[in-house]
Structures are given as structure tokens and as C-alpha cells.
């Protein structure tokens, strides 16, 4: 079943249609807040807030579905293009401040622009291959869920490997989490309140994506809280020493 039918088909009532459209707008707002906050904290902390592989993957997905396989829905096109531009800013921060994060790996430190070029090109090829395999409109949805899991996994891995919250914040995490929750609820509503609901929203694979996403992002929030609390304790101890 083509997921775009579920995303754009009329629903059983105007009230349900209003709720679904509101959730879609809230998703866009939440992700915009997350990306803008990520860019802000990247420059403030002189680092980057998105791990390299998820960043390459997101930029590639947004490029493919903004400029190659453009969705017919104007709102979605604008949304994807905005996210693409914001992620370019985050990538610039990663290149600019790479020396702060990759002192232990000079090969990466010196070649980050090349790594981004190869990584984004490879991811674009992968998204185009999936679109050619199953069709761009279906690939749009499934690859987006894949991007979400890669992003959540990368964010958690980066937080744990750094042992620091630099480049991140509760705003970045919570707006990212809520953005995905809003779109999942919207899709569920469109599935339930459409007379001939498609099979994909209730598929085992989609349910697996949702379950793993919640596990990863709540784990991230839990770890972020404990690491940030320890940072505040250390900062307070340093201030006491200076007195």
C-alpha cells in the first residue's frame, strides 16, 4: 500500500482531519526546534551535536526527497528543504570544530570534509537505490524511519563515548523525540479513521521501528540527565576551589 494515500486521503470527519494536520505541523515545528538548537549548541560549545554517520544519512535523505524525488505535498517539500539547510549548518560546525573532537584520531581530524563528501554520496546512492527498488513514495517513509533509528543510535553512542553533554541539550533531545511521536500519532490516526486503512502503519516492521526508537531515546534522556548532573557537581566543585 502506498503510504502517501494514507498521508493525504480525506478522513472520516473534519475534526479528525484537523487533529491530524495539527500533529503534522507540530512535528515540523518540533524538528525545526531540534535542528536549530543543535546548530546553536554546536557553535556555543565549539563542537557538533549530531554524530557523523547520522548527519551524513540525514543530509542525504533530505537532499534526495527535496531535490530528486520531490513529494507532491508542498508542506512536506518545504519541511524537507528546511531540514536540509539546517543540517548543512550542523555539518559546517562539525568541520569547523573537528580539531576539538578528533585530537585522538588525526586521520579523521584532517580529512573530515572528505569523509563528509564520501559519506553523504554513499548515503544518497543508498536512498536512491531503495527508491528504485520499492518506489520513491514508499521508500520515503521506510527510509525516514531508518534515519530516525540511525540518529537515535548515533546520539546515544556519541553521548556515552564523549561522557559529556557538550553539543547537546534537553531541548535538542525532547524536541527530536516529540517530533517523531507527533508524526507517529498522526499516521496512526490516519490509519484508524480512514475507511479502507492501509496495512503499513500496523505492520510488524513499523511497530519494531517505533519500539526501538522509544527505547533508544528514553535511554538517551536518562543518560543525559545523569551525565549533566555530574557535570553540574564538578562545575560547583571547581567554583568552590576558586573562592
From Swiss-Prot:
Disruption phenotype: Completely abolishes the production of novofumigatonin and asnovolin A. The chain crosses the membrane at residues 20-42, 51-71, 75-95, 112-132, 138-160, 169-189, 205-225. The keyword Membrane applies. GO terms for biological process: novofumigatonin biosynthetic process. GO terms for molecular function: isomerase activity; terpene synthase activity. It is found in: Membrane. Pathway: Secondary metabolite biosynthesis; terpenoid biosynthesis. One of its GO terms (cellular component) is membrane. The keyword Transmembrane applies. It is an enzyme of class 5 (isomerase). InterPro entries: PaxB-like (IPR039020). Keywords: Isomerase, Membrane, Transmembrane, Transmembrane helix. Terpene cyclase; part of the gene cluster that mediates the biosynthesis of novofumigatonin, a heavily oxygenated meroterpenoid containing a unique orthoester moiety. The first step of the pathway is the synthesis of 3,5-dimethylorsellinic acid (DMOA) by the polyketide synthase nvfA via condensation of one acetyl-CoA starter unit with 3 malonyl-CoA units and 2 methylations. DMOA is then converted to farnesyl-DMOA by the farnesyltransferase nvfB. Belongs to the paxB family. This is Asnovolin H synthase nvfL. It comes from Aspergillus novofumigatus (strain IBT 16806). The gene is nvfL.
Amino acid at each position: 500500500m502506498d503510504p502517501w494515500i494514507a498521508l493525504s486521503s480525506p478522513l472520516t470527519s473534519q475534526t479528525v482531519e484537523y487533529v491530524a494536520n495539527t500533529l503534522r505541523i507540530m512535528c515540523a515545528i518540533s524538528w525545526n526546534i531540534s535542528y536549530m538548537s543543535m546548530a546553536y549548541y554546536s557553535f556555543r560549545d565549539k563542537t557538533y551535536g549530531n554524530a557523523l554517520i547520522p548527519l551524513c544519512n540525514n543530509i542525504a535523505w533530505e537532499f534526495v526527497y527535496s531535490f530528486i524525488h520531490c513529494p507532491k505535498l508542498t508542506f512536506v517539500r518545504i519541511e524537507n528543504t528546511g531540514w536540509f539547510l539546517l543540517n548543512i549548518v550542523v555539518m559546517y560546525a562539525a568541520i569547523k570544530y573537528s580539531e576539538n573532537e578528533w585530537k585522538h584520531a588525526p586521520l579523521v581530524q584532517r580529512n573530515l570534509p572528505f569523509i563528509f563528501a564520501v559519506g553523504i554520496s554513499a548515503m544518497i546512492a543508498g536512498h536512491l537505490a531503495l527508491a528504485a527498488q520499492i518506489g520513491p513514495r514508499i521508500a520515503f517513509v521506510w527510509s525516514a524511519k531508518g534515519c530516525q533509528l540511525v540518529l537515535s543510535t548515533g546520539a546515544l553512542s556519541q553521548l556515552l563515548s564523549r561522557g559529556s553533554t557538550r553539543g547537546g541539550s534537553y531541548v535538542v533531545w525532547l524536541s527530536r523525540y516529540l517530533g517523531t511521536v507527533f508524526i507517529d500519532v498522526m499516521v496512526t490516526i490516519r490509519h484508524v479513521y480512514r475507511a479502507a486503512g492501509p496495512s503499513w502503519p500496523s505492520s510488524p516492521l513499523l511497530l519494531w521501528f517505533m519500539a526501538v526508537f522509544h527505547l533508544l531515546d528514553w535511554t538517551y534522556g536518562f543518560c543525559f540527565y545523569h551525565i549533566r548532573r555530574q557535570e553540574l557537581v564538578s562545575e560547583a566543585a571547581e567554583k568552590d576551589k576558586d573562592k
